[in-house]
Amino acid sequence: NVYEIINSNFVTIFGWMEDLLNKEPIQRVVKVLNNFDDSLKVEILNSSARTAKDAATSLNCEVGAIVKSLLLRTESNFILCLVSGDKRCSLNKVKKLLNMKDVSMADAEQVKSQTGFSIGGVSPVAHLNRTEILIDSSLSRYENVYAAAGHPNSIFKIAYKQLIELTKGKEEEIV
């Protein structure tokens, strides 16, 4: 029976999505979003949003509207750079801005221990450890942007101005 097959697939997919929403990293993001503005919702995608291109394809939006959350290691701590999906973070600009000689990309283990998220699902909010945030001004081209919500299949949509307010990030030119 076609109805039973469709219904069975729906229940399987819905169950998978519900399981994902209950994962601790996503729940941390949900809590922060709800405390900030309860109209902000985490969405679970059927396909991966691990890369900006994947996310844009899944959401049918421009790659530039995707927020890449990139953790950098500095001489003394970590800093999270939020960059438009169609841009590349300039380590030289970040070094100059921070007046530091040594700034590099954090490795997967550092990302996990600092933020509590795995690469591909790093949210701009709800990190395990307090992290300074820089937001590239190129994201301001978009009224609304999409950011990871703790897992490669989860995202949330947020107004650019709200992203600045929520993260308390400093808007800078870092691409």
Question: Predicted regions: what is each one?
Answer:
Residues 9-175:
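Extended, low-hydrophobicity, polar/charged segments
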